[in-house]
A protein has these predicted regions:
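Nucleotide-activated chemistry modules centered on ATP-dependent adenylation/adenylyltransferase
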Residues: 2-400
Length: 400
């Protein structure tokens, strides 16, 4: 009788390394799959493949879904200026969903009996993986050895060593999740709510030779098409270029306190130069190209979109409806946003757009008006005051 097949969502870390070896030893045919949303280098992927086979995997595959991640989610996060708590660009949470979808597809393609991942029982990722697998691969068993057996790091390392696999799984002071849309940093001083991270905890440091630099990001219908005049057809390449520029000034560092899906509070530090610069540039351009109510309702919808992504609700049927609204809102978001970069900070400067509503011939704010007379203005003010005059006419003694 043939062995059962299991696809392991393989990152190369301790938990998934243990999972591959343990399931192999237990008689499973293990298919290791690394879903890459832009966070792995070519060298890291090569090492992952080598280690997967050393651990006993029957097969290994890299599932590159970086561009799919952009087309199906990341661009909508830009359209919606999504920052959780007006701070965190929900990098890890949004990427996990697409990693899980890729793993589920792979499991169905090879006819797997089970899917395994290395999440613990403490965080959000267990929900994102399990929920996606339950929906995308119904009937396929979900295996989570680290969570279900409450394994310690020492137990996993000892098991690997006993079976001839040795790697540097030394518990570092900080843990990092690196992605195309930012790097999250956990551990160390972050566990103390009164402390921030020291300089050495960050992966990116100030390396720019100039004290300040100008960054110009050009958008067409809300999508990046050029950086400092250099055109980009590949949106991922454009994001990487902005990250390279912004990271040289160590821009995008911050710390977010938020609510986990389960309901407890959590604190995470991050560095995200590209997301911070892109979102603020995009927001700046929208201020000049969208109407007041377009901005208002898009802010509400963008917040909902980000919350649903974080809460593992990407597959909720309302999400394509939200994406359609966000896409429609971008039809006039064209032009170049100008930013000024300095070490550890940046500021918005201005925009150059053919759809700039501040260029209206009807008038200039605080200057001359051409679309109405003084009497028109007085009439508008009087009519606009009607609800207040009615209320305070009925309640003349009510004070504010």
């Amino acid at each position: 009788m043939a062995n059962k097949k299991v696809v392991v969502a393989f990152s190369g870390g301790l938990d998934t390394s243990y999972t591959v070896m343990k399931l192999t030893q237990d008689g499973w045919d293990v298919y290791a799959a690394c879903a890459n949303t832009g966070g792995f280098s070519a060298e890291q992927l090569k090492t992952n493949e080598e280690n997967a086979y050393k651990l006993g995997a029957k097969a290994y595959v890299t599932l590159d879904v970086t561009h799919e991640y952009y087309e199906k989610s990341l661009k909508y996060m830009i359209f919606g200026n999504v920052l959780r708590n007006n701070c965190y660009p929900i990098s890890v949470s949004s990427e996990r969903i697409f990693q899980a979808i890729a793993i589920a597809r792979d499991a169905k393609e090879i006819g797997a009996d089970a899917i395994a991942h290395g999440s613990t029982g403490a965080g959000n990722d267990q929900i994102r993986f399990d929920m996606t697998f339950l929906v995308m691969a119904p009937g396929v068993e979900i295996i989570t050895l680290t969570r279900d057996k409450a394994l310690s790091r020492k137990e996993e390392v000892d098991y690997l060593n006993e079976h001839g696999f040795f790697a540097d799984f030394t518990k570092l002071k900080y843990s990092y999740n690196v992605g195309i849309w930012g790097t999250s940093i956990c551990g160390g001083e972050i566990l103390d709510p009164t402390q921030g991270l020291p300089e050495e905890a960050y992966l990116k440091h100030v390396t720019a030779k100039e004290e300040e630099a100008e960054l110009k990001i050009t958008f067409e219908k809300g999508e990046i098409v050029a950086v400092n005049g250099e055109k980009f057809d590949d949106k991922i390449a454009a994001i990487q270029k902005i990250e390279e520029i912004g990271a040289s000034y160590a821009i995008g560092r911050d710390c977010n306190v938020g609510d986990t899906i389960i309901g407890i509070k959590g604190r995470v530090a991050f560095e995200a130069a590209a997301p911070k610069l892109i979102i603020e540039a995009h927001r700046l351009l929208e201020k000049s190209t969208l109407s007041k109510w377009q901005q208002y309702w898009k802010d509400q919808v963008g917040n909902w979109y980000g919350m649903f992504l974080h809460e593992s609700q990407y597959l909720e049927p309302v999400m394509p409806d939200i994406e359609a609204m966000l896409t429609s809102s971008q039809r006039n978001v064209n032009g170049t946003a100008i930013l000024k970069l300095r070490p550890l900070s940046f500021q918005t400067v201005g925009v150059d757009s053919p759809d700039d509503l501040t260029k209206s011939k009807l008038g200039e704010y605080g200057e001359m008006q051409h679309g109405w007379t003084a009497e028109d203005a007085k009439g508008f003010i009087k009519v606009s005051s009607t609800p207040l005059r009615v209320y305070y006419g009925m309640h003349p003694n009510e004070e504010r």
